[in-house]
Amino acid sequence: MAFVNTLLRTIRCSAVHTLVQEGRSLSLLKASHQLTQSRKIMLSNHVRKEEAKSEPNETLDLEEWKSILKSDIGNAEMVKTETQEDSSLNEMQELVEMWRLAGRAVPQSITTEQLQVLMELPTKTARKKYLKYLSVREVMKTNRKEKKKELKESKSKIESLDQLETKEDTPEKKNTFLLHVWDKSIDTMQRWKCVQAMKFGQPLVFDMVYEKNMSRYELENTVCQLMESEGWNRRSTDPFHIYFCSLQPYSMYHKELVKRYIGAWDNVFVTATDKSHVEMFPKEQLVYLTADSPNELKHFDHTKIYIIGSLVDRCQQTGLSLANAKRLNLATARLPLDRYLKWDVGAKNLTLDQMIRILLCLKDTGDWKKALSFVPNRKHDGFAEPAASKKRNIKNDGGMEYAASTKRNLQKNSKMYKFGASKSFIKPERTDDTSIRSTRKRWWEEEN
């Protein structure tokens, strides 16, 4: 076998040299090279085991090939967009530094999120105003920190002086059978209630589909109200099982919640899901609470699942939540503010923490007056009597007044038609006036 291979090699080399000397074409050389390279000499009748195994025909999966190409293109586009964003952020950072050197109102430190907001602003004046707002907020924050430090120092000084004065007069500590309740034990009790509510409690849904209808400032305000709502629910005696429905991962809502909770977002006893409330619960049990609804909520139903729209609309987008509920064919209701309150000024939209406090009070007591006491006093002029009780009072009082007035009229008529009954209705008999006239003095008569 080795001998044959060496022989072929020598023949090929000699043929190449002769062709080169005679000036043959390169195509012939290439063809001869391919032919000699692909030749296989079998000196035995037996076939090798490796070649005997028939290899399966490998078919090319076009879908997989397309997906790989698309993923490569998508990754390239993502890299391009990331580089573009980084370059634009660097440009905005340089612009802020230039304005700071020029002596304009610019914050000393600015985050990437604030730079992104600055990039989204369309005009130069809007960017100037936003930077001025950030600088003012930074100054206020530093002033607050300094005041807190001063208060702490003054408190520590006062406490040290008090300790020195009262060190001699301190009485001996007495034993007591009452145990001290620590803040940690209260916190664990509240968390245990939330765990029980997640298993057995009534659900309460916060609809998180209004991210596109709000500005960044309104979204931050909404997240603050959601955190307050979760706190009030945790501290209540019978908490709700709170659902954050349609909360997309890595959305502005999600990022702001993770940022505000400072690492404690995973430990909050709230069910956060990207599914809609229609997918989570049956439609028959859902009631969407909105101020634009024509239906009034007369009593709290413990079998229903109430939905609150997570929306802070400074520009008063009326009918947004009602349109969303109608699109999904859901029942709607509004709080009976006109029936129980003398509404004075302002819209009837309440904040999220006020809504959950009203619902918690209704769930515990069922008293509308207690529940609506959480409505701000600046919006109404006190409580009014319910319409049903007013009608009842009008019926009762009106009937009594009507009976009294008819009795009075009958007495008057009887006196009028009774002969000699009253001097006011029947004229008295005429008497002789001569004696009276004689006693009167005349103006022309002289006095004796």
Curated annotation (Swiss-Prot):
GO terms for biological process: methylation; mitochondrial tRNA 5'-end processing; mitochondrial tRNA processing; mRNA processing. Residues 190-382 form the SAM-dependent MTase TRM10-type domain. Its EC number is 2.1.1.-, 2.1.1.218, 2.1.1.221. Residues 137-165 form a coiled coil. It holds the Pfam family tRNA_m1G_MT. It catalyses: adenosine(9) in tRNA + S-adenosyl-L-methionine = N(1)-methyladenosine(9) in tRNA + S-adenosyl-L-homocysteine + H(+); guanosine(9) in tRNA + S-adenosyl-L-methionine = N(1)-methylguanosine(9) in tRNA + S-adenosyl-L-homocysteine + H(+); an adenosine in mRNA + S-adenosyl-L-methionine = an N(1)-methyladenosine in mRNA + S-adenosyl-L-homocysteine + H(+). Residues 144-167, 429-448 are annotated as: Disordered. InterPro entries: MT_TRM10-typ, MT_TRM10-typ_sf, Trm10_C_MTase_dom, tRNA_m1G_MeTrfase_euk, tRNA_MeTrfase_TRMD/TRM10. GO terms for cellular component: mitochondrial nucleoid; mitochondrion. One of its GO terms (molecular function) is tRNA binding. Keywords: Coiled coil, Methyltransferase, Mitochondrion, Mitochondrion nucleoid, S-adenosyl-L-methionine, Transferase, Transit peptide, tRNA processing. Residues 1-48 form a transit peptide. It is found in: Mitochondrion matrix, Mitochondrion nucleoid. Belongs to the class IV-like SAM-binding methyltransferase superfamily. TRM10 family. Mitochondrial tRNA N(1)-methyltransferase involved in mitochondrial tRNA maturation. Component of mitochondrial ribonuclease P, which cleaves tRNA molecules in their 5'-ends. Together with hsd17b10/mrpp2, forms a subcomplex of the mitochondrial ribonuclease P, named MRPP1-MRPP2 subcomplex, which displays functions that are independent of the ribonuclease P activity. The MRPP1-MRPP2 subcomplex catalyzes the formation of N(1)-methylguanine and N(1)-methyladenine at position 9 (m1G9 and m1A9, respectively) in tRNAs; trmt10c/mrpp1 acting as the catalytic N(1)-methyltransferase subunit. Component of mitochondrial ribonuclease P. Interacts with HSD17B10/MRPP2. This is tRNA methyltransferase 10 homolog C. The lineage of its organism: Eukaryota, Metazoa, Chordata, Craniata, Vertebrata. The gene is trmt10c.
